[in-house]
A protein has these predicted regions:
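A short, Trp-centered hydrophobic/proline-enriched beta-strand micro-motif
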Residues: 118-126, 173
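Flexible, glycine-rich active-site loops centered on histidine and acidic residues
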Residues: 96-102, 124, 136, 180
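Long, acidic (Asp/Glu-rich), low-complexity accessory segments flanking structured domains
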Residues: 223, 227-244
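A short core secondary-structure module
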Residues: 150, 154-205
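Short Ser/Thr-interspersed hydrophobic loop/turn segments at strand-loop and sheet-helix junctions
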Residues: 50, 74-78, 175-177, 197-202, ...
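Flexible, small-/acidic-enriched active-site or ligand-binding loops
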Residues: 200-229
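Alpha-helical interface subdomain recognition
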Residues: 1-90, 102-107, 114-119, 134, ...
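Short Gly/Pro-enriched turn/cap motifs at secondary-structure boundaries
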Residues: 88, 115, 130-133, 161-166, ...
């Protein structure tokens, strides 16, 4: 029998972050959204709280926590705002986790302390204009230059979170590497590897921020690499293992996104309950109408089942058990729950739900990307079917 009751230390963490989200994030985030500004002040406070180092060992500047703790934090943050939550999720799951999981001891000691403190943000350069769901279709190349013992990177990436802030310190880039060995027919062997590219490296450029429908307070950019040279020692893990690396990273990240989506879904419940109690029509609160009650009951059900799904996936991850299917289920269910809850919350608010000053308008805009980022809903269904042993052509 599954027991998803949280230990006291997790409940304490949840309460602390919930208070932070309510007292610090909520009063300020609307202004950041209005001006498409990155919330440096909020991010700095999150760094002081140790949130960026939650799942990492203390020897590297982390808090010695685990992935469950990170996901609890993401849920509580997203209950108020998703931009702040995705900044943390991408910085930890995509920026720091690959280095912790696959880096050399020198790479860990060079980068992790600053990433864990929040002094520096990391990003993961995977998606390309012609390679989103088909991540194996990477066209960015990294050629090894024996004369200088460097990788020379050329190509572009798109939709990369945390890629161009004032505190972005690195991007881990997935690239097609040409190995030093000759192929069977005399041509270089082609393989995907991941390489750490520090910000400010000549030939590495982050474009202007995208103008997005949602997540307006997060940083998302296109990256370009033109004869960008980095030391050979910046290779993350073994050459040719990049594809396997980012598949594992994405599997873990889906649990984090599921927690974030659950938070947004629950936030829609919170806002709808409050509005339904205050808004009066026909002489009584609209919450007295069964139609509104049923909507909110269904919204709570979706948020609750989403939470159970990501709890289960996270528990399997931490137990060292296979979790690919459970992560896909959690990501799929919670993201679709978030989209539905945001739509219903907007409907409950009526015309006010279409006004930017109401949080549900922001939640509505923020929700759709959850069905796309870190694996579309279609890809999640494909993964679930594959884990069930089904084949496809």
């Amino acid at each position: 029998m599954l027991d998803h009751r949280l230990a006291p230390e997790y409940e304490d963490l949840r309460r602390t972050v919930a208070e932070f989200a309510h007292d610090v994030v909520a009063p300020k985030i609307g202004e950041y959204y209005e001006h498409d500004e990155f919330p440096y002040e909020i991010i700095a406070e999150m760094g002081r709280m140790g949130l960026f180092g939650l799942p990492f060992p203390e020897e590297y500047g982390g808090m010695g926590g685990d992935y469950l703790a990170l996901c609890l934090v993401l849920e509580e943050l997203a209950r108020v705002d998703s931009s702040v939550a995705i900044t943390l999720e991408a910085a930890v799951s995509l920026g720091a986790m690959p280095i912790h999981r696959y880096g050399t001891e020198e790479q860990k000691r060079t980068w992790l302390p600053r990433l864990c403190s929040g002094e520096m943000l990391g990003a993961f350069g995977l998606t390309e204009p012609e390679g989103g769901s088909d991540a194996g279709a990477t066209r960015t190349t990294a050629r090894y230059d024996e004369a200088t013992d460097e990788w020379v990177i050329n190509g572009s990436k798109c939709f990369i979170t945390n890629a161009g802030t004032e505190i972005t310190g690195l991007v881990t880039v997935a690239a097609l590497t040409l190995s030093r060995e000759e192929g069977a027919e005399g041509s270089p062997t082609r393989e995907i590897s991941t390489i750490i590219v520090p910000s400010g490296t000549p030939g590495f450029t982050a474009s202007k921020k995208y103008s997005k429908v949602g997540w307006n307070a997060s940083d998302t950019r296109e990256l370009s690499f033109t004869d960008c040279r980095v030391p050979a020692a910046n290779l993350l893990g073994e050459a040719g293992r990049g594809y396997a690396q980012f598949l594992r990273i994405l599997d873990e990240g889906r649990i984090a996104i599921a927690a974030l989506a659950t938070g947004l879904a629950q936030g829609c419940v919170d806002e709808s309950l409050s509005y339904a109690a205050q808004r009066r029509a026909f002489g009584r609160p609209i919450g007295a109408n069964q139609a509104i009650q049923f909507k909110i009951a269904d919204m709570e059900m979706r948020a609750h089942t989403s939470r159970l799904a990501w709890y289960h996936a996270a528990s399997r991850l931490q137990a060292g058990e296979r979790f690919k299917k459970e992560a896909a289920i959690a990501k799929l269910h919670s993201s679709e729950a978030a989209v539905t809850n945001a739509r219903e919350a907007t409907q409950i608010h009526g015309g006010y739900g279409f006004m930017n000053e109401y949080p549900v308008a922001r939640m509505w805009r923020d929700s759709k990307i959850l069905e796309i980022g870190e694996g579309t809903s279609e890809v999640q269904r494909m993964l679930i079917a594959r884990e069930l042993g089904m084949t496809y052509s």
